[in-house]
Amino acid sequence: MIIVEVTGGLGNQMFQYALYRRLQLLGKDVKLDLSFYHTKQTLRKFELGIFNLPLQVADQREICRLKGYTNDASRIQKAFTTRIYKHPCIYTEDLDKGYQDMVLQKDSVYLSGYWQNECYFKEIRNRILEDFTFPQEVTDRKQDMVRQMKGSNSVSVHVRRGDYLQSGNAGIYGGICTLTYYRKAMD
């Protein structure tokens, strides 16, 4: 069995799902680990549910078995020892290496990473585009909102939060999402 860890916001979830879907279409026994969203370490929510996707979710027993945990004590021990020795059933994406074809060859592994490289899913691009199509259901509330937007000079502002807000990441993202940036966008 392969388990793909899902973390982060919607964009990261979409890349992780794309790898999951590719592995699934390769005939692999693959499931998703959504446990990140059940902890207190994040305010983020699992958002892929808006697409009504075919998801197989791993239960805690399957996750623990693949990661080599049997109880809380072994979990603590593994957390300490994996800093020194890599666990053979856990593969953490090495961002410096880029695309790693061997990820698609594995059969029994826990995959942790963002997988933000189209090579992981470009062969199933059309399927992914299909999967990420919003449902066509139009509620009264949505119709009312469309009428309001058409009847006025509408503007949408998206404020990036999370990783962009952390001062240590300013250099990575080029400082593009500063308070000044948002003020200029709204002027």
Regions found by a protein language model. Give the residues of each.
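Secretory-pathway luminal glycosyltransferase catalytic domains
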Residues: 45-187
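N-terminal pre-catalytic "stem/leader" segment of glycosyltransferase-like enzymes
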Residues: 1-45
